[in-house]
Swiss-Prot record:
Coiled-coil segments: none
Cellular localisation: Virion; Host nucleus
Protein name (record): Nuclear export protein
GO cellular component terms given for this protein: host cell nucleus; virion component
Further comment: Average number present in a viral particle is estimated to be 130-200 molecules.
A family per Pfam: Flu_NS2
Function: Mediates the nuclear export of encapsidated genomic RNAs (ribonucleoproteins, RNPs). Acts as an adapter between viral RNPs complexes and the nuclear export machinery of the cell. Possesses no intrinsic RNA-binding activity, but includes a C-terminal M1-binding domain. This domain is believed to allow recognition of RNPs bound to the protein M1.
């Protein structure tokens, strides 16, 4: 796990939590929750890769491992689309920078999860 990615997650989450988007604050809270969930999932996959023998225990604990992986990719795609949409509609430069960084982070995390999952398959 790249320490820069960890600090990026923390930075993005902190920035998003400070945003006031009016009526869409519920949506923003949902995005923050999904970012946190995605970070935890990515971290757990990374730990499983570090302990390569964990593939079998991971599969035994969670018989629907591949299905869960597919759901995470769906969440990433949804978050990417949501962040792109927010980026298009916001005029606040702080929010634009935050959403651009969030988008870059999502692309990096998607690639990391793909790499981890290929190593585990």
């Amino acid at each position: 796990m790249d320490p820069n990615t960890v600090s990026s997650f923390q930075d993005i989450l902190m920035r998003m939590s400070k945003m006031q988007l009016g009526s869409s604050s519920e949506d923003l809270n949902g995005m923050i929750t999904q970012f946190e969930s995605l970070k935890l999932y990515r971290d757990s996959l990374g730990e499983a890769v570090m302990r390569m023998g964990d593939l079998h225990s991971l599969q035994n604990r969670n018989g629907k491992w591949r299905e869960q992986l597919g759901q995470k990719f769906e969440e990433i795609r949804w978050l990417i689309e949501e962040v792109r949409h927010r980026l298009k509609i916001t005029e606040n430069s702080f929010e634009q920078i935050t959403f651009m960084q969030a988008l870059q982070l999502l692309f990096e995390v998607e690639q990391e999860i793909r790499t981890f999952s290929f190593q585990l398959i």
